[in-house]
Amino acid sequence: PTFDSAELATATAVAKGLPASPGAACGEIVFSADDAAEAAALGKKVVLVREETSPEDLAGMVAAQGILTARGGMTSHAAVVARGMGKCCVAGCSEVTVHESAKKMVVNGKEYHEGDVISINGTDGSVYDVAIKTVSPELSGDFGTIMKWADDVRNLGVRANADNPRDARQALEFGAEGIGLCRTEHMFFEDERIPKIRRMILADSESERREALAGLLPYQKGDFKGLYEVMGERPVTIRLLDPPLHEFLPKTEADINQLSEQFGISKEAIEKKTVELHEFNPMLGHRGCRLAVTYPEIAEMQTEAILTAALEVAKEKGYKIKPEIMVPLVGNVKELRFVKNTIDETAKKCFEKAGMELEYMVGTMIEIPRAALTADEIAEEAEFFSFGTNDLTQMGFGFSRDDTGNIIKEYINDGILERDPFQSLDQKGIGKLVKMACESGKETRPNIKLGVCGEHGGDPDTIEFMYKTGLQYVSCSPFRVPIARLAAAQATIKNRK
């Protein structure tokens, strides 16, 4: 939705953040995901206000009309998830100070409490302390005509980032040709699953971890079956578990007490494990393929879920499904080889048990600069590269994607940067890494599949660059798919020889 233009004209913004996800929202302020879900269940419209969001806030983000965060950039958790849901989000609003425990926020000296009404504009980052009427957009038949023209012209595939059947259906409605990124971690945060993943993390032995993972297997398999049933024979790329494990552990005293009672584990043991898993820089720590190396049983469970789901849907529906399993955060070919061996061994067991086989692909995200620089070696094991340009930009620039919103704003104002590199790919620097990886990857494996799944996949300038670099597809949030289709057509026309 957008704001009613007449009402918007009379309103004055009290703060301005980053326009992280377009649209408009108006509602009562809530400061926790649980409060957002409870209020929405009572029919209230709410805006979720957080210092910053994490995967455990997902239910509240779904329930809210919009999201406002005091910290975070254009590729922060709040921004990426909100864009994926087509939900309004203003991120990195430094004028807002959040006091979650007191259920209030302070904006330039003025206090706002839970239940006060605000309006936020994700298109320009404005925050208002009054209610502004929202208007739902309408699509005319002309939209379909233009999209058909674009599809007739373009030579670049367009996929969507989708984590569940609902998002997958939305993606298909917008014309996506497959799923370029399914983030499996989002599936773990539902109420009946989070205790099981926490039990696995708190386990003291491999056998205990395997027991906890066995409880998660049916849920993961069901999730993947749902995706395959919606997508049919279209490609689906599923990323193995990526975030550090500490993100799944309880943060509040109440949650720690509940977990302690549920599993008969002392509060001290839970707190000790939380301290053990604490990292000073978790985004460069124990995450991605490093989890699959140290805890191969996690990759085994996820591989079994992916392949068993595909086998069952192929048998039930008669579809020819070719799963694409993506290993995240690879920086060394030996890491990928280790995890790929785990995947292949698990696949053999799955096929023997099912009495049937199917083809599958194993590839990796190119998101660490070293992976781009050694892409010739990594292509020995990877059947596809998908460029994770959010992290590649973060590591290439040395910019934290969650903490540099204000710095980037200053740099743009001072003429140091032309655009936010997290919104539009830096073609001179990060683009060089992408180009180098494509060229050296093709030297090793001429038929390697190349795509991009970072948020840059919905940016027109980046799409043209990726087309010229020789990628086969881009992937973006479902609501950005029409823009990507149009931009792909424009890139094809502009670069005709």
Annotate each predicted stretch with a short phrase.
Residues 139, 149-497:
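Conserved alpha/beta-domain cores
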